[in-house]
Regions:
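A conserved hydrophobic position in a structured secondary element of the catalytic/binding core
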Residues: 67, 119, 190, 212, ...
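Hydrophobic packing residues within well-ordered alpha-helices of enzyme cores
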Residues: 21, 75-76, 195, 217, ...
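Left-handed beta-helix
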Residues: 1-8, 212-313
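Conserved core of the sugar-phosphate nucleotidyltransferase
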Residues: 127-255, 269-272
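Conserved N-terminal catalytic core of the sugar/cofactor nucleotidyltransferase
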Residues: 1-15, 20-34, 39-136, 140, ...
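Conserved beta-strand scaffold positions in the cores of enzyme catalytic domains, especially
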Residues: 37, 87, 149-151, 274
Length: 313
């Protein structure tokens, strides 16, 4: 009898504060909301855009959205169509590592060997189909090599100082997909000279889009930040019960902020792979300059369609 292949999961990370863009989101929406709950680019919120992308690879019942309780007035209307268990509510925002762990333990309690993709909720992607085809390819790579955890690396368009960079290493051994490379090192906040060299060498921007088996990612987190892992493991029996909310509130009370990129990924770089993303404009919309650059990109793309006869010869 044929065994059905389990559909993957998608976790959308939407618990951040987005303080640097608050003046812009305030002028657009009229209130003090984080950027993921605002229509920063186009007519849809960034969270809505991310949910649309997620639906290309995972059904609604395998999509989780991680939010922070203090943003309830913003996320509740946007997630009204989702079943309550699919909305993972953190009592407070404690950084990306707790958000990732909370969602992973939820999934691992149901299906620890299922594949999971993590998508930030506040990025711009010019072509959903092309971008998510890379996510699907990462899923396929993880099916071929079950201990693989893959990050999508964005082909660098400039020597960006504000992004994290991924230095690729050798191709993944014993693997028939030649474009998957081992991660040699992560670089944060490079100098101008370093960033120019990184771009010349063909290194990648870190998109923070990550794909792997729930159990494998959990094991890497356990290696990197064992105390954080054990704290969440202690409340695992309460997940999915009436006591979950109270247990999570106790856990988060006084819990330190832990950054997933800095505290986890950098510590286990040798165990990760990177898959290059090409033919897509991507921007993390982390500050006003990047938002303006994205607006400019959209305008430049639109001009040939609006005024086809006005292009220079």
């Amino acid at each position: 009898m044929l065994q059905m292949r389990a559909r993957p999961w998608v976790v959308i990370l939407a618990g951040g504060e987005g303080f640097r863009l608050r003046p812009l989101t305030r002028s657009i929406s009229g209130d003090d909301r984080p950027k993921q709950f605002c229509a920063v680019v186009g007519t849809e919120t960034l969270l809505g855009d991310t949910r649309r992308r997620a639906a290309l690879v995972a059904p609604a019942n395998r999509t989780l959205v991680v939010v922070s309780k203090q943003h309830e007035c913003f996320y509740r209307p946007l997630l009204a169509d989702m079943r309550e268990p699919s909305v993972v509510v953190q009592p407070e925002n404690r950084g990306t590592a707790p958000a990732v762990l909370y969602a992973l333990f939820r999934i691992a309690k149901l299906a620890p060997d299922d594949l999971v993709a993590f998508l930030p909720s506040d990025h711009f992607v010019s072509n959903d189909q092309v971008f998510m085809a890379h996510v699907s390819r990462a899923f396929e790579g993880c099916r071929q090599q079950t201990d693989l955890v893959t990050l999508l690396g964005i082909t660098a368009a400039c020597a960006e100082l504000g992004y994290g960079w991924i230095e690729p290493g050798r191709p993944v051994a014993g693997f028939h997909f030649a474009d998957f490379r081992r991660v040699r090192q992560f670089w944060e906040k490079p100098t101008v000279a370093q960033a120019e060299e990184f771009q010349t060498q063909g290194w990648f921007w870190n998109s923070f889009v990550m794909v792997g088996r729930a159990s494998t990612i959990l094991e890497l987190i356990k290696q990197a930040v064992p105390s954080v892992y054990e704290a969440f493991a202690g409340v695992r029996p309460m997940l999915g019960t009436r006591g979950e909310t109270e247990a999570i509130e106790r856990l988060y009370c006084g819990f330190p902020a832990v950054d997933f990129s800095r505290n986890v990924l950098s510590a286990v770089a040798a165990d990760l792979a990177v898959l290059p993303v090409r033919d897509v404009y991507w921007n993390d919309l982390g500050n006003l300059d990047r938002v303006i650059a994205t607006w400019r990109h959209l305008l430049e793309d639109a001009i040939p369609q609006i005024m086809p006869n006005k292009l220079p010869a």
